From Swiss-Prot:
Protein name according to UniProt: Translation initiation factor IF-2
Keyword GTP-binding (UniProt): yes
Region (G1): 466-473
Similarity remark: Belongs to the TRAFAC class translation factor GTPase superfamily. Classic translation factor GTPase family. IF-2 subfamily.
Superkingdom, natural source: Bacteria
Positions with a binding annotation for GTP: 466-473, 512-516, 566-569
Region described as G2: 491-495
Cross-referenced CDD domains: IF2_eIF5B, IF2_mtIF2_II, mtIF2_IVc, UDM1_RNF168
Functional note: One of the essential components for the initiation of protein synthesis. Protects formylmethionyl-tRNA from spontaneous hydrolysis and promotes its binding to the 30S ribosomal subunits. Also involved in the hydrolysis of GTP during the formation of the 70S ribosomal complex.
Domain tr-type G: 457-626
C-alpha cells in the first residue's frame, strides 16, 4: 500500500490478498495433538475473552456471524496483513443501535455448531466487497484503532430492518418447530396403536390356528380309533421306515462320548442336515416340501450347533415330520392367492367336485355296487359330429371312436357323420333315437288348428283387380272418401294398398292391386290373400289382357268374383258388351243367367257404390267367414319397404289370431319384435285382429312381398327359423347362378348364354313389390344377344355402398321412387356412375330398352351394284397387275366391295384399289363402258374372270 498517503483513511484491499477482519476479543494458539504410531497434528485453538460492562453502560449487541465450514488454520497466516483493517471496521461499527439485548458469551470451539441467533450481518454496506467477511462484534470506544467510515442513516435503517426480519423468522421457526413436534408425537402414537393392533390380530390368528390344529388332531385320533387296520398298516410302515435324517446311528465299539470335531467343520462322511422350520410342525399336518426346509433369514449357527452336539455324542432328537394338511372346503373358499402362498403350495390340487366324485366311486366300489346304464332319447339331425353325438348320449367320445375302430373306421371327434351312422352308434350304446330333419324347425308354426268354440265372425277381405286405367283405385277412393290416385305417379297404382271401410256397421277390408302387366306377381298375391275378388271392367273398354289375367288368378285362388262395370257415365259405355265378352272367359253374370254378381257403378260420380258394398256383404254372409282371435297371429306380407326414419316397415294382413306390440314374429327369412302397429289411417293401435291390415315396425330386415308370417314363442326360435330360410335362399341362388350341368344340349345353351352381352344394373325402389315387378319386366326384354343383369336390388334409398358396387361392376343405378343421399351423389359424381330416377314404370322400361338396344351389334346389309368382265390383264411397273374390264351389268363404284368369280366360284373378296378410265381416276363406271381395275393386296387375276361389285351398309337394331 505504498501508493497511499498517511492521511488517507479509506479502506483499500490488495487484489492479491483476501480481505479478512480480526475477531476482537479472540486469542489464537496452537496445540499439538499426539496420535498412535508416532503421528502428531497441529491444531489452532481460539480463546474468546469475556467482556465485562459497567452497570451504567448499555450492553452492545454482538452481531452473530454465520458459521463457516472453512478451516480456522488459515487465520494466523493472514492476521498480520489485515490487522489495521479489522480494527478500523470494528470502530466503524461502534455507533450502530442495539435494539436487542444479547449477553456476550464465549464462542464454542467448533465452528460448525448450529447458531440459533438471527444473522444480523447479512445486509452488507454497498462499499463492501462480496469477498469480504461479515461484520464482527464492535469494540469498546476506549480501545484504539483506525476509524474508516461512519454508518449512514440508510445503512442503519437497513440493519434495523434486518434485525426485525430475523426476529420474525425466529418466531416463525419456533412455531413450526412446535407444530412439527406435535405432528411427530401424533405419528408416534398412531404407529404405536397400529403395532398394538397388529400384535393383537397376530395373537388371535395364532390362537385360531392352534384351535384348528387341535380340532384336526382330535378328529384324526377319532378316525384312527374307528379304523384300526389302516393304523396298524401305518405303524408297520413306520417301523420299516429308516432312521430320521440327521440322527446318527450308534456304531459298535465306539463310545457315545467320542472326540468332538471343530464346530465349524462338518463331520466326514455324513452330510449336514438341513434346518427345519420349528413352527411348521404343530400347525401343518403334512411333510413339508423341500422349498420350505430352510426358513428365510435363518443363520447357519443352528446347523453348526446341532452338528456339534451330534459329534459330541449327545443323543439327537429325531425330527418329527408333521402330516400334510389337506385344506377343507372352508379354507379353499376363502382367502386370497398371493405369491408366497402359491410358492408354498405343492401344486394344483383336485377340485371339490372331483374329490366328491372320487369318494362316491370309492363308496360304490366298497359296497360292490354297479352303476346302471341310463338309456336316453337322442335327437339326431341329418348330419352330426362325433363330439356332439357323444354329448347327446352322455358318453365319452373315446368310447365311440373305439367302437368305430372295431368296425374298421378311423375317425376323429370332429368328423361329421350322417344320420344313419349316428343311429347305429346310438342304438349300439343302448339309446333310443329320434330322427329330425332341418326343415322340422318350421313345424307347428303355420296351419295350427283353431279352437272351434272360440270362433267369431270376421270381416271379409276383398281384392280389387282389373286392367290398368279401368278405375280400380278411383273406385276404392270413392268408397273410402279419399284421393289416392292423385298421389300415384302417372295416375297408375304401383303398390298394393290395403284399407278397411265400414258399411252398415260391418267392416270390409279392401286390397288394391296394380293393373299394369308388370305387376303380375302382385295380382297373384292379392288373389291368394283374399276372400272375394271384385273384377273392375271399364264399360267403354271391355275385357283387356290384364282383365283376363285377373280372372285366371281369381279362379286359381278359388275365390268368388263380383263384376263391377265401371265408367257407365261415359257416352261410349256399353255394359252389355262387357257381359258378353266375359262369357268367353267362363264368367257368367246374373244378368246373363249366371251366378256371378254384377254391379254397374261410376267411381267418378259415385253411382251405385252402396249396391256394390251390399253385394260384398251378401257374398261374405254366404261364405260364413270366421276366425279365432285368441290364438297366435298368422298372416301374409302384402308389401314391405325400408323407411329412412322408421326402418323396415311391412304392410301385413292378419288372417288368424290377434297381433300385439311386443310379439316376436317370423316373416320369410326375417324376424323381429313388433314395436308398433299402424292402421291404414296412420293411427297407432293396441292390437290387430283377423282380416285387419296394419303396418308393423321392428323387423330386422325387409321381407319379401307375399311371405307368410307367424308369431313364435321366443327369439331363439325366430332366429333359428330365419337362419334356416336364409340358408335355403342362398343355396337356391348358388344353384341358379351355377346353372344346370349334364346333357350336351344344356352345355351348348350355357355356351350360347356366355356369349350374350349383359347390361348391368343396380335397382333400388321404395317397396319390394315394385322392385320385383321391375325385375320381371326387364327379364322379358332380354334376347339371345343381350340381357339385363341385376347386380343388386333392394328397398330403400341409394347409398354409398350401392355406388361402390356399381363402380366395381360397371353398372348403372336406377332409383324407383327413391333418391340418393348427398354422400352417394358425391361419390357417383367422382367415379362417373350414372344415377337415373323414375317414378313411372313405363319410362323406366323404355329407357332400359333403348340402352340395351345400343348393345346390339348392327345389322350388315349388302346392296348389289353390278358386274364387270376382265378382258385383258396388264403388268404395270410399281403398281402390279391391272385388269382391263368392261362393265356388263349395273355400275362399279370406287371403294366398293368386290368379289372375283372364276368358273362360278368366288376365289377372292376384297376392295377396289383403283378405278380408272383413260388414265383418269373416276368415281364410278356405268354399264357398257370399259375401265381399269386393281385390287387391294391381290394380283391373281386372269382374263375371263368376272368381278362382282357391291355396297355394305350397317343398320342399327332395336329390341
Amino acid at each position: 500500500m505504498s501508493d497511499k498517503t498517511n492521511d488517507d483513511k479509506t479502506l483499500s484491499v490488495n487484489p492479491k490478498k483476501t480481505l479478512t477482519l480480526k475477531r476482537p476479543g479472540v486469542e489464537q494458539s496452537t496445540v499439538r495433538q499426539n496420535f498412535s504410531h508416532g503421528r502428531t497434528k497441529a491444531v489452532v485453538v481460539e480463546t474468546k475473552k469475556r467482556k465485562f460492562s459497567r452497570p451504567d453502560e448499555k450492553p452492545e449487541v454482538e452481531a452473530a456471524a454465520a458459521p463457516k465450514p472453512a478451516a480456522p488454520a488459515a487465520a494466523p497466516q493472514q492476521a498480520p496483513a489485515s490487522a489495521p483493517v479489522s480494527a478500523s471496521a470494528a470502530q466503524a461499527s461502534a455507533p450502530q443501535p442495539a435494539p436487542v439485548k444479547a449477553p456476550a458469551t464465549k464462542a464454542p470451539a467448533a465452528p460448525s455448531a448450529p447458531v440459533t441467533k438471527p444473522h444480523v450481518a447479512q445486509q452488507r454496506p454497498v462499499h463492501q466487497r462480496p469477498g469480504g467477511q461479515q461484520a464482527q462484534r464492535p469494540r469498546p470506544a476506549d480501545r484504539s484503532g483506525m476509524v474508516l467510515n461512519t454508518l449512514s442513516r440508510s445503512e442503519m435503517d437497513a440493519r434495523r430492518r434486518a434485525l426485525e426480519e430475523a426476529q420474525i423468522r425466529e418466531v416463525e421457526e419456533r412455531a413450526r418447530a412446535v407444530e412439527e413436534a406435535k405432528r411427530r408425537a401424533e405419528e408416534d402414537a398412531r404407529r404405536a396403536k397400529e403395532r398394538e393392533e397388529s400384535a393383537r390380530r397376530q395373537a388371535e390368528e395364532e390362537a385360531r390356528l392352534k384351535a384348528e390344529a387341535e380340532a384336526r388332531r382330535k378328529a384324526e385320533e377319532e378316525a384312527a380309533k374307528r379304523m384300526p387296520q389302516p393304523e396298524a398298516r401305518s405303524e408297520r410302515r413306520d417301523d420299516a421306515r429308516p432312521a430320521p435324517y440327521g440322527a446318527r446311528p450308534q456304531q459298535a465299539g465306539r463310545p457315545q462320548g467320542g472326540r468332538p470335531q471343530p464346530a465349524g467343520r462338518p463331520q466326514q462322511g455324513s452330510p449336514r442336515p438341513a434346518p427345519i422350520i420349528a413352527d411348521a410342525a404343530p400347525i401343518a399336518g403334512k411333510p413339508l416340501p423341500q422349498s420350505q426346509l430352510r426358513k428365510p433369514g435363518q443363520s447357519d449357527d443352528d446347523d453348526d450347533r446341532r452338528s456339534g452336539a451330534a459329534r459330541r455324542g449327545v443323543a439327537a432328537k429325531p425330527e418329527v415330520r408333521a402330516p400334510k394338511v389337506v385344506k377343507g372346503e372352508d379354507d379353499r373358499r376363502r382367502g386370497k392367492l398371493t405369491l408366497t402362498s402359491n410358492l408354498e403350495e405343492e401344486g394344483r390340487s383336485r377340485s371339490l367336485s372331483a374329490m366328491r366324485r372320487r369318494q362316491e366311486k370309492f363308496k360304490r366300489s366298497q359296497m360292490q355296487e354297479t352303476r346302471e346304464k341310463i338309456s336316453r332319447e337322442v335327437t339326431i339331425p341329418e348330419t352330426i359330429t362325433l363330439q356332439e353325438l357323444a354329448q347327446r348320449m352322455a358318453e365319452r367320445s373315446v368310447d365311440i371312436i373305439k367302437y368305430l375302430m372295431k368296425q374298421g373306421q378311423m375317425m376323429k371327434p370332429g368328423d361329421v357323420i350322417d344320420a344313419d351312422t349316428a343311429q347305429l352308434i346310438a342304438e349300439e350304446f343302448g339309446h333310443t333315437v329320434k330322427r329330425v330333419a332341418e326343415s322340422d324347425v318350421e313345424e307347428g308354426i303355420f296351419d295350427v288348428a283353431d279352437n272351434e268354440s272360440a270362433m267369431v265372425s270376421r270381416p271379409p277381405v276383398v281384392t280389387i283387380m282389373g286392367h290398368v286405367d279401368h278405375g280400380k283405385t278411383s273406385l276404392l277412393d270413392a268408397i273410402r272418401h279419399a284421393n289416392v290416385v292423385s298421389g300415384e305417379a302417372g295416375g297408375i297404382t304401383q303398390h298394393i294398398g290395403a284399407y278397411q271401410v265400414v258399411q252398415n256397421g260391418q267392416k270390409i277390408t279392401f286390397i288394391d292391386t296394380p293393373g299394369h302387366a308388370a305387376f303380375t306377381a302382385m295380382r297373384a298375391r292379392g288373389a291368394q290373400a283374399t276372400d272375394i275378388a271384385i273384377l273392375v271392367v271399364a264399360a267403354d273398354d271391355s275385357v283387356m289382357p290384364q282383365t283376363i289375367e285377373s280372372i285366371n288368378h281369381a279362379k286359381a285362388a278359388g275365390v268368388p268374383i263380383i263384376v263391377a262395370i265401371n265408367k257407365i257415365d261415359k257416352p261410349a259405355a256399353d255394359p252389355q258388351k262387357v257381359c258378353t265378352a266375359l262369357l268367353q272367359h267362363e264368367v257368367f253374370v246374373e244378368s246373363m243367367g249366371g251366378e256371378v254378381l254384377d254391379v254397374e257403378v261410376s267411381a267418378k260420380n259415385k253411382i251405385n257404390l252402396d249396391k256394390l258394398l251390399d253385394a260384398v256383404l251378401l257374398q261374405a254372409e254366404m261364405l260364413d267367414l270366421k276366425a279365432d282371435p285368441d290364438r297366435t297371429a298368422e298372416g301374409v306380407v302384402i308389401e314391405a319397404q325400408l323407411d329412412r326414419g322408421r326402418g323396415s316397415v311391412a304392410t301385413v294382413l292378419i288372417q288368424k289370431g290377434t297381433l300385439h306390440p311386443g310379439d316376436i314374429l317370423v316373416a320369410g327369412s326375417e324376424w323381429g319384435r313388433v314395436r308398433a302397429l299402424v292402421n291404414d289411417r296412420g293411427e297407432h293401435v293396441k292390437e290387430a285382429g283377423p282380416a285387419m291390415p296394419v303396418e308393423i315396425l321392428g323387423l330386422q330386415g325387409t321381407p319379401q312381398a307375399g311371405d307368410r308370417f307367424a308369431v313364435v314363442a321366443n327369439e331363439a326360435k325366430a332366429r333359428e327359423i330365419a337362419e334356416y330360410r336364409q340358408r335355403l335362399a342362398r343355396d337356391k341362388a348358388v344353384a341358379r347362378q351355377s346353372g344346370a350341368r349334364g346333357s350336351l344340349e344344356q352345355m351348348m345353351n350355357q355356351l350360347q348364354v356366355s356369349g350374350t352381352k349383359e347390361f348391368p344394373l343396380v335397382i333400388k325402389g321404395d317397396v319390394q313389390g315394385s322392385i320385383e315387378a321391375i325385375i320381371n319386366a326387364l327379364d322379358k326384354l332380354g334376347t339371345d344377344e343381350v340381357r339385363a343383369r341385376i347386380v343388386h336390388s333392394g328397398a330403400g334409398g341409394i347409398t354409398e355402398s350401392d355406388v361402390s358396387l356399381a363402380e366395381a361392376s360397371n353398372a348403372a343405378i336406377i332409383g324407383f321412387n327413391v333418391r340418393a343421399n348427398k354422400q352417394a351423389r358425391d361419390s357417383a359424381e367422382q367415379q362417373g356412375i350414372e344415377i337415373r330416377y323414375y317414378n313411372i314404370i313405363y319410362d323406366l322400361i323404355d329407357d332400359v330398352k333403348a340402352a340395351m338396344s345400343g348393345l346390339l351389334s348392327p345389322e350388315r346389309r349388302e346392296t348389289f351394284l353390278g358386274n364387270a368382265e376382265i378382258l385383258e390383264v396388264f403388268n404395270i411397273t410399281k403398281v402390279g397387275k391391272v385388269a382391263g374390264c368392261r362393265v356388263t351389268e349395273g355400275k362399279v363404284e370406287r371403294g366398293a366391295g368386290v368379289r372375283l368369280i372364276r368358273d362360278n366360284v368366288v376365289i377372292h373378296e376384297g376392295k377396289l384399289k383403283t378405278l380408272k378410265r383413260f388414265k383418269d381416276e373416276v368415281a364410278e363406271v356405268p354399264s357398257g363402258q370399259e375401265c381399269g381395275m386393281a385390287f387391294e393386296n391381290y394380283d391373281d387375276i386372269r382374263a375371263g374372270d368376272v368381278i362382282e361389285a357391291f355396297r355394305v351398309e350397317h343398320v342399327s337394331r332395336t329390341l
